[in-house]
Amino acid sequence: MLIMVVGAGLVALTLISNLFAVGPAFENLITDFRPALTEQSIKTAHADIAGLSAVQTEFSTKLVPALSQQLKMTPEQFNGFVSQNFPKVAAGMGALPTAIPTFDGLINTLDQQRPLFASADAIPTESLPATTVPWAWVGAGILVFLIGLAALRSPKAGGAAALVVGLLLLVVPLALSLPGKAADADQLNANLKPIYTQALVDNAKGGLATIGAMGTEMGTTMLPALATQLKMTPEQLQTFLGANFPATAQALQTMPASLERFNGLVKVFDNNLSNYETLKPVGLARLILILMVSGGLVAALGAVSIVTARRE
């Protein structure tokens, strides 16, 4: 009878823990984030951030003073000129001091999570997706329940089956390193909780839109207008920028690709926010522990059933 209770408990826990929703949510999130957490992706993201940071520094400390002098303005007058005539450039430059540390912190956090992510990515194994976990859990519960039912009719045979299945439920998670993987997944969950929010997604979208508009207006409107005022051709202006302001010149070429990569990362966060909300309350290490304890209990009850049947 107790064996049946354990089996029913495993099935009930699957439903109570919402594992049939958690499994797909976990798998979808892991699959979508996997490309963003490669070593190369992290290095590229750091390079993109460094490029934006260099533009911010160069614009305020070199480009503004130099262009102000060329146009016979003070730096303050030039900044006012930019704000009035190229508001998107002004807004973008104003957003960079906040956006750069935000994205740098986000990328650093993701980089730090890579070992935990790799471990969680192997739940239950590297070749089996997480969507198999709830089915395996329910299957184990039903099997244990049926074994308990059989033990009522044939204590010796049912007890032997309970002993074998119980030991499997105890040993297989250890063989698959599930306790460690589950603990890593829980730690990953805990580390992401402070940052993985709707506010993060909304702020990142807004910041990228502002910076993207800055790059577009700078390249298509501001620089051609400045070239006219400086009596330069567009080609001469590009040469002038490349020689004197290399970070800005390079950013004009690389910013579209950089922003596309950042937008792709933000899209991954946005698309998986509901998945994260689904799995966030679930403690996987606790569930694995319950499964193993249940296996040990079933094995013990099976052994007792065998001994009792022999005495009779």
Regions found by a protein language model. Give the residues of each.
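Extracytoplasmic/ectodomain regions of membrane proteins and secreted proteins
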Residues: 12-133, 174-292
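Juxtamembrane interface at the cytosolic side of transmembrane helices
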Residues: 1-15, 131-180, 287-312
